[in-house]
């Protein structure tokens, strides 16, 4: 029993030493500890909150208590038909999600001027499983929101790391 406990502890140390992180966790700089999210749709906010929690980052309740403020200005979801069947039904769609944002520090200084993040995905529309397609589209949209959040966080990381080296 003691050998098993020792093995578990040693294995845990090896995992952390090699840089292993749980899925969804991001390695973020110290400057990104308390973040306030201003704006955004419910789905975007849910994904943002999930990514922050997985990365051990606190979401501040107000901008006054935040080290960083992420302003979401505009979100746009589009769906475009890419191909049609011989009967005229849509076979393939392209989903497009665009979000505009900027990042401020705790003193309202602009760290990242207004930028746009664009995520696109295609998916096949099986005419035999119409109900399942709605669920598939919602799942894909959730993944698109998550990809956008990760892209925004990556841009923030680059800005914080470059300002730390100055």
Which functions belong to the PLM regions below?
Residues 1-7:
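Bacterial N-terminal signal peptides that target proteins for export
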Residues 71-116, 122-138:
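Surface-exposed short loop/turn segments
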Residues 14-17:
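C-terminal motif of bacterial Sec signal peptides marking the signal peptidase cleavage site
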Residues 31-76:
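N-terminal segment of the mature soluble domain
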Residues 39, 52-56, 103, 107, ...:
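Sec/Tat-exported extracytoplasmic proteins
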Residues 23-26:
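Acidic, polar-rich low-complexity tracts and alpha-helical solenoid repeat scaffolds
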Residues 19-21:
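Bacterial signal peptide processing site
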Residues 131-166:
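C-terminal/domain-edge helix-coil "capping" segments
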